[in-house]
Amino acid sequence: MGSIRPFNVKRTAEEIAEKYPSLFTEKFEENKRKLEKMMPDVSKRTINIISGYLTRYVVKKKEKAEREIEENAAS
């Protein structure tokens, strides 16, 4: 069972993902490094939490897009 993320973490991660859609990938470490450069004054723990949620958000978004393509192809 996973942990529940605070609303501000979700909102921040989703805003960043929408603002820079091609910048973030499915790799946590890469996303973490990019966030550290974007937000240098944020604590390491917060960066890790946002990066983790952002990574999952990107993966879910990609899987959803793939599912929609498959459903449209089957129709």
UniProtKB/Swiss-Prot annotation:
The keyword Glycoprotein does not apply. The keyword Ligase does not apply. GO terms for cellular component: ribonucleoprotein complex; ribosome. SUPFAM superfamilies: Rps17e-like (SSF116820). Keywords: Ribonucleoprotein, Ribosomal protein. It comes from the Archaea. GO terms for biological process: translation. It holds the Pfam family Ribosomal_S17e. One of its GO terms (molecular function) is structural constituent of ribosome. Belongs to the eukaryotic ribosomal protein eS17 family. This is Small ribosomal subunit protein eS17. It comes from Thermoplasma volcanium (strain ATCC 51530 / DSM 4299 / JCM 9571 / NBRC 15438 / GSS1). The gene is rps17e.
